[in-house]
From Swiss-Prot:
Domain of life according to the entry: Bacteria
Membrane association type: Peripheral membrane protein
Family label: Belongs to the ATPase delta chain family.
Coarse class of the protein's main subcellular location: membrane
Protein name: ATP synthase subunit delta
Gene Ontology MF terms in the entry: proton-transporting ATP synthase activity, rotational mechanism
Organism: Cereibacter sphaeroides (strain ATCC 17023 / DSM 158 / JCM 6121 / CCUG 31486 / LMG 2827 / NBRC 12203 / NCIMB 8253 / ATH 2.4.1.) (Rhodobacter sphaeroides)
Gene3D superfamilies, per the entry: N-terminal domain of the delta subunit of the F1F0-ATP synthase (1.10.520.20)
Function statement: F(1)F(0) ATP synthase produces ATP from ADP in the presence of a proton or sodium gradient. F-type ATPases consist of two structural domains, F(1) containing the extramembraneous catalytic core and F(0) containing the membrane proton channel, linked together by a central stalk and a peripheral stalk. During catalysis, ATP synthesis in the catalytic domain of F(1) is coupled via a rotary mechanism of the central stalk subunits to proton translocation.
Keywords: ATP synthesis, Cell inner membrane, Cell membrane, CF(1), Hydrogen ion transport, Ion transport, Membrane, Transport
InterPro entries for the chain: ATP_synth_OSCP/delta_N_sf (IPR026015), ATPase_OSCP/d_CS (IPR020781), ATPase_OSCP/dsu (IPR000711)
PROSITE patterns: ATPASE_DELTA (PS00389)
Length: 186
């Protein structure tokens, strides 16, 4: 890990630990989980939010006011809004995506859950997602939360990352394996 990334992840971990402990002490982990999901989605979808957090053009006060307005508009809990305001005042909003991921991991650990990253060729139906989660739960022995993305280049099938293991049942991977087998024969 490079030094700047290490520093960023260290900063994010400190904010994540603090907001997690505050929410846990107040019994507000469900609200914090909802806030982190909303912030993660907002970060992915909003170039303006990413610019606000990462651009050196904005002064501390501007960042602080803007993030407070964003928190109010999103209806975030007081603990989350105060944490974001503090991060804005310290010019630490650039670590927001790492902090969100860290908090989500802490909440999942607290709940005895693990997250499986699922990439599918087409969106999963609710019943397919439920069956996949049940199958992964049987394998992992813990509740599994699915984080799904769609990648049409897979043609069909799934790629599932669960902890340190990866299961690739995609047509794309099977075609690549056949191509390699044909190269060895011919």
């Amino acid at each position: 890990m490079s030094e700047p990334a290490s520093i960023s992840s260290g900063i994010a971990a400190r904010y994540a630990a603090a907001v997690f402990e505050l929410a846990k002490d107040e019994g507000a982990l469900p609200a914090l989980e909802k806030d982190m999901d909303a912030l993660g989605a907002a970060w992915s979808e909003s170039a303006d939010l990413r610019d606000l957090a990462t651009s050196p053009v904005y002064a501390r006060e501007e960042q602080q006011k803007a993030i407070a307005a964003v928190a109010a508009k999103m209806g975030l809990s007081t603990v989350t809004a105060n944490t974001l305001a503090l991060m804005g005042s310290k010019r630490r909003l650039f670590v927001l995506p790492q902090m969100v991921a860290d908090v989500q991991n802490r909440i999942a650990t607290e709940k005895g859950e693990i997250t499986a990253e699922v990439t599918a060729a087409a969106p999963l139906s609710p019943e397919q997602a439920a069956r996949l989660a049940a199958t992964l739960k049987a394998r992992a022995g813990k509740d599994v939360k699915l984080k799904t993305t769609v990648d049409e280049s897979l043609i069909g099938g799934l790629v599932v990352k669960l902890g340190s293991s990866m299961i690739d049942t995609s047509v794309k991977a099977r075609l690549a394996a056949l191509q390699n087998a044909m190269k060895e024969v011919g």
